[in-house]
């Protein structure tokens, strides 16, 4: 589990050649309003896959990607904007994932673009 503000990013083995990424609220009794954009590039031909969750309340497990290939076959990005349920302030981060050797070498990098702002 990787804490991302008021959300938790969960990373699990998906199959023999993939990992699974999901989000949940750190406190499931306090859902978090979020905007999520996921982009993946995978395979030898560079297939592109995108997913958008706009203005979505996240409390329990929300799957972001069921199949992230873990043999150096996929570049994976998540742009995540979330509103703190207690302060109503917004934060945004980018999460980059790259997984190799059947998940034995998985790197997840988090960069915060801003925290504690209003719109």
Regions found by a protein language model. Name each.
Residues 1-119:
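Extracellular jelly-roll beta-sandwich "head" domains, especially the C-terminal globular C1q domain
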């Amino acid at each position: 589990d990787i804490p991302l503000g008021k959300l938790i990013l969960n990373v699990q083995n998906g199959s023999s050649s993939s990992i699974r990424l999901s989000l949940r609220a750190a406190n499931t009794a306090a859902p978090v309003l979020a905007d999520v954009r996921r982009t993946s590039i995978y395979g030898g031909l560079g297939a592109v896959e995108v997913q958008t969750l706009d203005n979505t309340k996240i409390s329990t497990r929300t799957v972001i990607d069921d199949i992230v290939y873990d043999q150096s076959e996929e570049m994976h990005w998540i742009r995540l904007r979330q509103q703190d349920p207690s302060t109503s302030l917004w934060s945004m981060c980018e999460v980059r994932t790259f997984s190799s050797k059947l998940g034995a070498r998985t790197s997840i990098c988090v960069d915060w673009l801003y925290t504690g702002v209003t719109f």
